[in-house]
Amino acid sequence: MATAAQRRFCRCACFCSQNLYVARYGLHLRFRDEHQLRRDYGQLLRSRGCVTSKDFQQLLEELEQEVGRRRRLGQESAVRKALIASSYHPARPEVYSSLQDAALAPEFMAAAEYSTSPGADLEGLLQRLETVSEEKRIYRVPVFSAKFCQTLLEELEHFEQSDMPKGRPNTMNNHGVLMYELGLDDPLVTPLRERFLLPLMALLYPDYGGGYLDSHRAFVVKYALGQDLDLGCHYDNAELTLNVALGKDFTGGALYFGGLFQAPAALKETLEVEHVVGSGILHRGGQLHGARPLCKGERWNLVVWLRASAVRNRLCPMCCQKPELVDDEGFGDGFTREEPTTVDVCVLT
C-alpha cells in the first residue's frame, strides 16, 4: 500500500472558495467576492438573521479570514508538525509505537480477518457487525479496547494542555487534534486503514471505492461545555468515514443521519445514533449527518475520513466537478495526478 512519502497527494482548488461554514447561520457558503456573496446568498442570509450592514460586513470579514487560513493551511500545518516532532514530550509514548493487536477490540480484528479470508462475502461480514441502518448502510463495530481508549485520551489531553501549536481538526470544529501533526498518522492510523479498514470497507462499500482506499485524514474532535457543543449538518470530504467514540463520561451528543447529500429531501427522515465508547460508526462520506448538543461532560471522538483517489480523481465530492489539483502536504485531500484505476462507483447526479 502506498504512503504519502511515496506518492504526491493534492487537494482541489475549491477548498479555498467552497463549503465555507458559518455556524451562526447554519450555512455552508461558496465565496469569491462581496458581489457574488450578495447575489447568491443575499435573500437566504437575511432569512437566517444576517440583516444589517454590520451583520454582512462581519460575515464578509470572517469569510475572507477563513479563505486566508485555508490558503496557508498546508504550509502552517507542516511547520506545526515539525515543531511538535522536535519539541513535544509525550505523556504516553507507547501510543506512538506501531499499532498493536492488544489495542484493538477482538470483534474488530475478527471482522477484518474474516474479510480477508477466501470466500468472504457481505452476508458473512454483516454477521460480525451491528447493522445500525440497512437502508442508510450504517454499521457499528467495537474498534479499540477500553485500555487503549484511556491511554490515547491521556495522551491527547496532555497534548491539549501543552504549549505546542494546535491546528483546527477540520473546517467546522474548533477543538481537537490533527493526528498527522501529532505524529500519529504513521504508527496508528495508516496501519488501521491498510490492515483492517480496507478489507472491511471493500466488502461493505465496493461501490464507493471501499477496496481502493489509499489515503485518509484523521483527527480527534472534542466537545465540552464552553467549547464546541454540537455540530451542524454536513457531509464529509471522504468516500467513507469511521467515527470512534473514545470517551469520556458524557450525556447527549448523539449523531444524526439523513440521506445522501445529492438526494432530494435528504434530511426529511433522520436517524439518531448514540455513541458507544470504543466502538466505531462506519458510514458513507456523502451521508448528511451532524451531532446533537452535548448535555454534560466531555466527548472525544476519533474521526477518520477514508479516501480513494481512484474515485475522487474523477469528481471532487465538495464541488462536484473534476478536481482542479493543487499540490499539498501529507495525504492532502486524497487526490493524485495519476490516471485513476477504473472503478465502478455509485454517483448520484
UniProtKB/Swiss-Prot annotation:
Coiled coil: none
Residues holding Fe cation: 234, 236, 289
Family named by the database record: Belongs to the OGFOD2 family.
Reported cofactor(s): Fe(2+); L-ascorbate
Binding site for 2-oxoglutarate: 299
Keywords: Dioxygenase, Iron, Metal-binding, Oxidoreductase, Vitamin C
Biological classification of the source: Eukaryota, Metazoa, Chordata, Craniata, Vertebrata
Official protein name in the record: 2-oxoglutarate and iron-dependent oxygenase domain-containing protein 2
Gene Ontology MF, one: L-ascorbic acid binding
Record EC number: 1.14.11.-
Cofactor remark from the record: Binds 1 Fe(2+) ion per subunit.
Family matches, as Pfam families: OGFOD2-like (PF25238)
Listed transmembrane segments: none
Annotated InterPro entries: Oxoglu/Fe-dep_dioxygenase_dom (IPR005123), Pro_4_hyd_alph (IPR006620)
UniProt xrefs under SMART domains: P4Hc
Domain Fe2OG dioxygenase stretches: 214-308
